Amino acid sequence: MANQDDKIKIITDNRQARHLYEILETFEAGVQLLGTEVKSVRAGKVNLRDGYVLVRNGEAVLINVHISPYEQSSEYFNHDPRRTRKLLMHKKEISKLIGQVEQKGLTLVPLKMYFKGSWVKISIGLGRGKKLHDKREDLKRRQDQRDMARAMKR
């Protein structure tokens, strides 16, 4: 039986990342947040669409992810919505990411943010950017699968 701590509640999903990138591998990381940020995340006020992950000075950082200011807090105690946030990962994982990003020219993109128990986690994907013809192939393949499913239904 699952513990209360093991429950996963998805907050937001970056569906556009799977369209723009071919995801080769995924990683889970914790996110270092302020109190008002956690409250906004619980309210679901997060946008991952423009975000990306960089490795600076041996630390993974989440850049350009918008977490809206907490509405019930005063302006003085609130946070900057697009501030750089540190990701909490093991050094071994970070060194693996550094090697793959630098050698193969891959990109790190946030895929989804979720609560795992009471901790905010983020799933990041190591991906290669898709070209226009790759995107068209994916759309065509999905449309063909829908057509086949409709034909089988009849």
From Swiss-Prot:
<dbReference type="InterPro" id="IPR023620">
    <property type="entry name" value="SmpB"/>
</dbReference>
<feature type="region of interest" description="Disordered">
    <location>
        <begin position="135"/>
        <end position="154"/>
    </location>
</feature>
<dbReference type="InterPro" id="IPR020081">
    <property type="entry name" value="SsrA-bd_prot_CS"/>
</dbReference>
<dbReference type="InterPro" id="IPR000037">
    <property type="entry name" value="SsrA-bd_prot"/>
</dbReference>
<dbReference type="GO" id="GO:0005829">
    <property type="term" value="C:cytosol"/>
</dbReference>
<protein>
    <recommendedName>
        <fullName>SsrA-binding protein</fullName>
    </recommendedName>
</protein>
<dbReference type="GO" id="GO:0003723">
    <property type="term" value="F:RNA binding"/>
</dbReference>
<dbReference type="Pfam" id="PF01668">
    <property type="entry name" value="SmpB"/>
</dbReference>
<comment type="function">
    <text>Required for rescue of stalled ribosomes mediated by trans-translation. Binds to transfer-messenger RNA (tmRNA), required for stable association of tmRNA with ribosomes. tmRNA and SmpB together mimic tRNA shape, replacing the anticodon stem-loop with SmpB. tmRNA is encoded by the ssrA gene; the 2 termini fold to resemble tRNA(Ala) and it encodes a 'tag peptide', a short internal open reading frame. During trans-translation Ala-aminoacylated tmRNA acts like a tRNA, entering the A-site of stalled ribosomes, displacing the stalled mRNA.</text>
</comment>
<comment type="similarity">
    <text>Belongs to the SmpB family.</text>
</comment>
<dbReference type="GO" id="GO:0070929">
    <property type="term" value="P:trans-translation"/>
</dbReference>
<keyword id="KW-0963">Cytoplasm</keyword>
<keyword id="KW-0694">RNA-binding</keyword>
